């Protein structure tokens, strides 16, 4: 539409959480929200939202210039619908990844972050109004744990690094 802005300059530096929020948008609080239980039903879905249930993967790179070069880049990854998933971070220079996060199989399993994300999204999408509170708590819990792990490992890696700054 010609009425929608193509781009905007942010008022502050964006965090991975900010980007995730935008990519999860489904016009919350407007008549166009496909999950809304209020308003004119003919308006729901009038505009296609970014955070739809047909998303399957999102990744973004966070560059942290205040850290040494080998720790600067973190890739944040999430599977399933952006409105119903949780991002996890990966250092760019790792050689192995825990099995739960590393891969998946063709068989649905709770032993895989990929399949757990897909199952949560599928169940929550069908009952969004009753599920969104739980999904948001899960997303914030995962994010909080991931931020704590990043802080812990950044400190550990900085302490053991032969040169504190590049």
Residue ranges of model-derived segments:
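Conserved small/polar residues in nucleotide/adenosyl-binding loops
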Residues: 159-166
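Long, internal scaffold/assembly segments composed of regular secondary structure
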Residues: 1-45, 49-53
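Substrate-recognition/cap regions that form aromatic- and gly/pro-loop-enriched pockets
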Residues: 39-41, 45-154
